[in-house]
Amino acid sequence: MIGTKEIYTVLKADSGVLALVTNAGTVEKPNFRIAAATVEPKTWQVTESTITIYQSGPDSLGEIYDVNHTVNCRASTETKAKNLARAVATALHRVTFSKMMFYCSVEQVIPPADETDNFNNPVTVRVMGTK
């Protein structure tokens, strides 16, 4: 999963993102609801603001790779989900790591399917670079 670890690293260190994500821990020992996973952990609540990161495009086998990831920005209201998605895109867009760069686009908000769901504003992160 080229880029997943790097996306996670940036988001866990960005104060703008962390200010909007639920902290289930304490000030001394924070536990922010950010995970590299396709499905949210079962312990996370529908009322929380959360982020999940996963590779959503195929692996590139060439020397130059171009791989898409999805960052799901979920929250109890549409406005909170949009604000979180904007913060994620701002934190990641045009960030460079060794041999890779991120380009972001904020997708349309997906409304809750039912009362057990919340709003999701996905961010597509295009990870480009050389191996």
Where would I find each of the regions flagged by the language model?
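Residue-level detector of short coil/turn "hinge" positions at structural boundaries
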Residues: L18-A19, H69, K99
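A generic structural signal for short, solvent-exposed coil/turn residues
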Residues: T26, T43-Q45, E63, S98, ...
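A common structural junction motif
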Residues: G16, A89-S98
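Small/polar-rich, solvent-exposed N-terminal microdomains that initiate assembly or binding
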Residues: M1-P58, T79
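Mid-chain, well-packed structural core segment of small domains
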Residues: T70-A91
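Short, surface-exposed, polar/charged, turn-prone segments marking secondary-structure boundaries
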Residues: T79-L84, S98-M101, T130
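Short, charged interaction patches at domain edges and termini
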Residues: M1-A13, Y54-D66, M100-K131
